[in-house]
Swiss-Prot record:
Keyword NAD recorded: no
GO cellular component: plasma membrane
Membrane topology: Peripheral membrane protein
Name by which UniProt lists this protein: Phosphate import ATP-binding protein PstB 1
Family the UniProt entry places it in: Belongs to the ABC transporter superfamily. Phosphate importer (TC 3.A.1.7) family.
Cell location: Cell membrane
Gene symbol of the encoding locus: pstB1
Keywords: ATP-binding, Cell membrane, Membrane, Nucleotide-binding, Phosphate transport, Translocase, Transport
Length: 252
């Protein structure tokens, strides 16, 4: 059986005294898309941010438990968070390209690593934009501002920016919720094409999106992981009443 690429063990996250995640344990597998679903405030985005150690930036956040990646707990003192975030990249709900050219957006992480060779940078830009399914749309205007792109194009440039650092895992926090249906469909197609090379965790409020793109789905409610398993099986035959009620739209 395939070994998990990421193991979350007994993870709890607190914002001050408020417990946002309750002893969650969940494994993620290589070259799969996992959807995290649940109503607002259920803990799904909190889990994503814990995997990327974004809580480090907030003194109110306390994390207990462990997240094992490459055989090591990412919350150990030895973890280099800069290197971690290169291997576990993140794409946010609102497209957030930097106020610079499309080219410079994509190579931003490489420049931080000290890469200066133009050939290497050029190759990374093309490869990453191809991977994000936007190369043909922007190849003739790489030195135009990314801010001038449509929302869907901006989001795909943000995906390309993550791809350029050669991550193993990509975290996506509601990456299509701010986009129109056509742009959202292009993002879904892009993600589906990327799973041959990457492991992806996608927070989504769309049951249809989860059913279309993901291999596995985790349902969160009030900080608890209620159910986790094969997406088709969960949607056809949920094991918990809360899961069925959420999937069928009785609450959420």
């Amino acid at each position: 059986m395939t070994e998990p690429i990421l193991k979350v063990n007994d993870l709890s996250v607190y914002y001050g005294k408020k417990k946002a995640l309750h002893s969650v344990s969940i494994d993620f597998y290589p070259n799969e898309i996992t959807s995290l679903i649940g109503p607002s405030g259920s803990g799904k985005s909190t889990l994503l941010r814990a995997i990327n150690r974004m809580g480090d930036l907030n003194p109110e956040v306390t994390v207990t438990g462990s997240i094992i990646y490459n055989g090591h707990n990412i919350y150990s003192r030895r973890t280099d968070t800069v290197e971690l975030r290169k291997e576990i990249g993140m794409v946010f709900q609102q497209p957030n390209p930097f106020p610079m050219t499309i080219y410079e957006n994509v190579v931003y992480g490489l420049r931080l690593k000290g890469v200066k060779d133009k050939k290497i940078l050029d190759e990374a830009v093309e490869k990453s934009l191809v991977g994000a399914s936007i190369w043909d749309e922007v190849k003739d205007r790489l030195h135009d501002s990314a801010i001038g792109l449509s929302g869907g194009q901006q989001q795909r440039v943000c995906i390309a920016r993550v791809l350029a650092t050669s991550p193993k895992i990509i975290l996506l926090d509601e990456p299509t919720s701010a986009l129109d249906p056509i742009s959202a469909g292009k993002i879904e197609d892009t993600l589906y094409g990327l799973k041959e090379k990457y492991t992806m965790l996608v927070v989504t409020r769309s049951m249809q999106q989860a059913s279309r793109i993901s291999n596995r789905t985790g349902f969160f409610l009030a900080g608890d992981l209620v159910e986790y398993g094969n997406t088709k099986e969960m949607f056809m035959n949920p094991q918990k009443q809360e899961t069925e009620d959420y999937i069928t739209g009785k609450f959420g």
